[in-house]
UniProtKB/Swiss-Prot annotation:
Enzyme Commission number(s): 4.1.1.11
Job description of the protein: Catalyzes the pyruvoyl-dependent decarboxylation of aspartate to produce beta-alanine.
NCBIfam families: panD (TIGR00223)
SUPFAM superfamilies linked to this entry: ADC-like
Organism lineage string: Bacteria, Bacillati, Actinomycetota, Actinomycetes, Frankiales
Gene3D superfamilies per record: 2.40.40.20
Post-translational changes noted in the entry: Is synthesized initially as an inactive proenzyme, which is activated by self-cleavage at a specific serine bond to produce a beta-subunit with a hydroxyl group at its C-terminus and an alpha-subunit with a pyruvoyl group at its N-terminus.
Domain of life, per lineage: Bacteria
CDD domains xref list: Asp_decarbox (cd06919)
Protein name as annotated: Aspartate 1-decarboxylase 2
């Protein structure tokens, strides 16, 4: 059996352009592609934080260091310049590989420069008190340190 696993996430990127008449895809700064280990042509899911739109397309490389996140083609009707998006890639893995796999998670600033990275898909944006972990209920007080989700999974796997 193959499992579909998160391989990369670029969190809270700012859309810099949208071109309805372009053939399709999402243009991503080549430096971000490399840091996230994404290839041109690789399938990605884009989640628009502003309006909830969710779409699938493929990545193409934009100029390195430009900060470009460009939504191309029909998706430009769903995502506008200035919107915050999460760009997600998934990969198929056999069970053993999936249990060892560590995703790449990038955090970017408003200019789409990398400000942090990690391997915990539930980690909130560093230094942003309005971002919450995705794996802790918000109505239950937590007064003990919570290990990252990735570390907890690896720890659980090591004891099996």
């Amino acid at each position: 059996m193959l499992r579909t696993m998160l391989t990369a996430k670029i969190h809270r990127a700012t859309v810099t352009q949208a071109d309805l008449h372009y053939v399709g895809s999402v243009t991503i700064d080549a430096d971000l592609l490399a840091a996230a280990d994404l290839l041109p042509g690789e399938q990605v899911t884009i989640v628009d934080i502003n309006n909830g739109a969710r779409l699938e397309t493929y990545a193409i490389a934009g100029p390195a260091g430009s900060g470009i996140i460009g939504i191309n083609g029909a998706a430009a009707r769903l995502v506008q310049p200035g919107d915050l998006v999460i760009i997600i890639a998934y990969g198929l893995m056999d069970d053993a590989e999936a249990r060892r796999h560590v995703p790449k998670v990038l955090f970017v600033d408003a200019a789409n420069r990398i400000i942090g990275h990690g391997d915990d898909p539930a980690e909130p944006l560093p230094g942003d008190p309005s971002s919450l972990r995705g794996d802790i209920p918000v109505d239950i007080p937590v007064d003990i340190p919570v290990p990252t989700a990735a570390a907890a999974v690896r720890s659980a796997m090591a004891t099996q």
